[in-house]
Amino acid sequence: HSPHLTAFALANQPLACRYEALLRRGQRSAVPVVPWAPRGSAAFTEGVGRAVERHAASWAVLLGNHGVLVFGSSPMAAAKFLVTLEEAAAAELRALALGGARDLPSGALADE
């Protein structure tokens, strides 16, 4: 598991889209959290399905009290996105020591 993303999942906190590299990977919104449910259960799959429907612009969902689920156009694209997400989560947590991360400028999250 990705340790920094897992911290967000354990806290049931979405990961804000503040890291510029996420934009380059196509992420333009916060990574949502799916409430905890036993893996493979109907509640789990329904929760993931609802999150994907509600947050169609997100390439990942955080699994409450568990970890992260990443999507991509290919396994390699998903793996690269996971690395970028983990970097973003680590940077967000480190930024807390400096007063917290700042949002990107207005319009930065708009589709180009």
Q: In which residue ranges do the predicted regions lie?
A:
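Glycine-rich flexible loops
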Residues: 2-112
